């Protein structure tokens, strides 16, 4: 049996960097981890409630958190930042207040910044949201996967692999379906591979979506 390792953890320090940058004493480490989860969940929930896209995509690629003694700096990498910024000028302030309320941090300042990423569909999180939206609307899984591959080809990637698992199309027995286009060298540490695993609730139950995107080789 092949041992499956997470492609992001496998490449930490070479082609991947950490999404949380801070130090803590061993006793306080779990608190810092919970704080990060609260921040990410709060931001995702806010974006979900306040942005409405026909494709059902929120457009968050990743959320980076940097902490100092007196400051928490949060950078949201978005594919479609206009949804959050241009709609209402006060949305960012409102989001900041929501996160501060959730954390209940009085001694530290919180700063949230938004960075736009080029080629949003070249990022697996945004692509997984797109596929999830299609599956919720009862589009055939093959059609959804092929459309996702077309979108990544426009983003100038070298290869993609998509896997969907669960009760696909409402069938009684759960199964795994996958499709690959181009090269996806999972064993090459120098290969820059983006990966995400995403859960979507459909009327037939929960489906798991996994996406590997090969961007470049060092």
From Swiss-Prot:
Check the record and name the Gene3D superfamilies matching this protein: 3.30.300.20, Ribosomal protein S3, C-terminal domain
Where does the record place the KH type-2 domain? 43-118
Q: Please indicate if the UniProt record lists Chloroplast as a keyword.
A: yes
Where in or outside the cell?
A: Plastid, Chloroplast
InterPro entries per UniProt = KH_dom-like_a/b (IPR015946), KH_dom_type_2 (IPR004044), KH_sf_prok-type (IPR009019), Ribosomal_S3_C_sf (IPR036419), Ribosomal_uS3_bac-typ (IPR005704), Ribosomal_uS3_C (IPR001351), Ribosomal_uS3_CS (IPR018280)
Q: Which GO terms describe its biological process?
A: translation
Pfam families, alphabetically? Ribosomal_S3_C
Which GO molecular-function terms appear in the entry? rRNA binding; structural constituent of ribosome
Naming one, the record's GO cellular component terms include: chloroplast
Q: Is DNA damage set as a keyword in this record?
A: no
Q: State the source organism's domain of life.
A: Eukaryota
Cystine pairs: none
Keywords annotated in UniProt: Chloroplast, Plastid, Ribonucleoprotein, Ribosomal protein, RNA-binding, rRNA-binding
Q: Give the quaternary structure.
A: Part of the 30S ribosomal subunit.
Query: Which HAMAP family does the UniProt entry name for this protein?
Result: Ribosomal_uS3_B
Q: Give the matching NCBIfam families.
A: rpsC_bact
The record's section on PANTHER family has: 30S/40S RIBOSOMAL PROTEIN S3, SMALL RIBOSOMAL SUBUNIT PROTEIN US3C
Q: Give the family per the record.
A: Belongs to the universal ribosomal protein uS3 family.
Q: What is this protein called?
A: Small ribosomal subunit protein uS3c
Organism equals Gossypium hirsutum
Q: What is the lineage of its organism?
A: Eukaryota, Viridiplantae, Streptophyta, Embryophyta, Tracheophyta
- The gene for this chain is rps3
């Amino acid at each position: 049996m092949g041992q499956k390792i997470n492609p992001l953890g496998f490449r930490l320090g070479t082609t991947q960097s950490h999404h949380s940058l801070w130090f803590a004493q061993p006793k306080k480490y779990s608190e810092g981890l919970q704080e990060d989860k609260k921040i990410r969940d709060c931001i995702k929930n806010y974006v979900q409630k306040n942005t409405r896209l026909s494709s059902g995509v929120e457009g968050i690629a990743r959320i980076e958190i940097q902490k100092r003694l007196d400051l928490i700096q949060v950078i949201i990498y978005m594919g479609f930042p206009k949804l959050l910024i241009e709609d209402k000028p006060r949305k960012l302030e409102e989001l900041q207040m929501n996160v501060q309320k959730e954390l209940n941090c009085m001694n530290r300042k919180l700063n949230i910044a938004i960075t736009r990423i080029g080629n949003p569909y070249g990022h697996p999180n945004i692509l997984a949201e797109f596929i999830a939206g299609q599956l919720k609307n009862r589009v055939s899984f093959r059609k959804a996967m092929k459309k996702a591959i077309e979108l990544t080809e426009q983003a100038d990637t070298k290869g993609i692999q998509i896997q969907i698992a669960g009760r696909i199309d409402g069938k009684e027995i759960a199964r795994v379906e996958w499709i690959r286009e181009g090269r996806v060298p999972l064993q090459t540490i120098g290969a820059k591979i983006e990966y995400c695993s995403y859960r979507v609730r459909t009327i037939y139950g929960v489906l798991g979506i996994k996406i590997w995107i090969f961007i470049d080789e060092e």
